[in-house]
Amino acid sequence: MILIMDEDDGRDSSGIRLRDVTVVRGGRRALDSIRVDFEAGSSTALVGPNGAGKTTLLEVLAGLRQPSTGSLTGAQPSVAFVTQTHSRSWLPLSVGEVLRMARFRPTLLPHRLGPDDHAAVDDAAGRLGVRDLIDAPLDRLSFGQRQRVLVAQALARQADVLLLDEPITGLDLVSQERILGVMEAERDAGRIVVLSTHHLDEARHCDRVLVLDGRLVAAGSPEEVLVPDVLREAYGEKVLGDHAHHDHGHALLLVDDHGHGQH
């Protein structure tokens, strides 16, 4: 599901700054004293085991969850957040209707969308390869097709910040490559792109990687951070050896809390 937030409060729109952000959920610290900046024209991957706070951090960036302590400043005026949840209320809608929702504004009736709105929808549909599905009901699509529609909807909004929660999980390789290519293009267009992932090869497409385990374990380039010693600090022995699994020659296989491979 995509959640769109418009907040122009006059703050600096060049980036987002988190200072000592802590989020307490159910008596435990989902995030603990996170201090990090997200700059315009950058892409950041969040990695870490299940329960590490990746989705919580995305929710904080989206304005959906307030920090228990700490501050978030300099937020961009518009955010598009592609979550892992597909809204059931959208299933009877056509792909075109779902995409056009991204262009709705409080002061604009749906049937009053202008040429720029329709152009944005058409461009997003083409970039995600769903233009030929424009009249198809969402409930007739495969999981992968729906995911591409939701990412296309986020692009159609043309928000300044694009947040994606595990966007390529369960997708075929063609869909994965298409979404990764779009993500890189959005970064190059000057947007802030932040995604959570268990795919280390996906994380390598980003400028920076944050390794989370409630706290910020490490931050840096993929070459600096996606190495066994750093990953073991977050995952423990859930990293299966230095070269236990290769994806395109260099990714490591991570396992979840039940010992199952995440790939």
Named regions from a protein language model:
Residues 115-133:
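Conserved ABC ATPase "signature" region
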Residues 62:
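Helix-to-loop junction immediately C-terminal to a conserved catalytic motif
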Residues 224-263:
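ABC ATPase nucleotide-binding domains
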Residues 47-49:
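The feature captures the beta-strand-to-loop junction immediately N-terminal to the Walker
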Residues 137-141:
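Conserved ABC ATPase signature
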Residues 162-166:
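Catalytic Walker B motif of ABC-type/P-loop ATPase nucleotide-binding domains
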Residues 214-224:
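Conserved switch/coupling elements of ABC/ABC-like ATPase nucleotide-binding domains
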